[in-house]
Amino acid sequence: HQSTCGGMAYDTMNQILWVTGQGSTWAQANAITLSHLENYSFEDGYHPIEFDMSYNLYKIKRASFMTYHDGALFVGFFTQDNASVIEKYLINADGTLYEKEDMNLKRTVGVTDPVAYAVSMQVISGKVQGMAFYNNKILLTRSWGILPSEVQIFNYSRYGILSTSEAYKTIKFPERLEQIYQDGGSIYALFESGLMPTGCHPLTELTVL
């Protein structure tokens, strides 16, 4: 599992927590229901919680971060320098991901069953660690190592390019900013502090803006 701290999203309509993952070959989106989480106890057998749903994501190299917005799951792939993508997956009324047959996958790798289908894709710049929506705006966090972080703000467009040059506003942040989450009039910011280089200065709290 090589996701960042931004690799979780919560579906508020269906009360499902989504978690990024990596299978033996493909990126994955995995889901756990809120009721399952509330009834889980590690002390009951000392086993990790099992996913209620798991989907291979065939069109994205790795699922690094994700967010939920307006009945859809947005999944992005972190790269250090090269351009990358965010893909949009619709969520059905029962909380499952929208699936359909993909003739290209059937022809190239022999996948014949319906698969989680990305209905749109947007290009992003490198170093993107997290994503949020706020007042019809898209917010992307960018950070790498000890360099200052930033939040880039874009006007929301289904097919818009979300590269650095297209941002209409950029806000500087301290280093190691990863995921952000919008709730009401507040933005919650999560900073990396679990890796060896950052562990000597752990950050155990969320920052509310």
Write out the residue ranges for each language-model feature:
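Asp-box/WD-like beta-propeller blade repeats and closely related beta-sheet repeat scaffolds
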Residues: 1-6, 35-70
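Conserved beta-strand positions in repeat-built beta-propeller and related beta-rich domains
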Residues: 17-23, 75-80, 140-146, 189-194
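Conserved blade-ending motifs and adjacent loop-strand segments that build the rim/top face
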Residues: 113, 119-127, 160-184
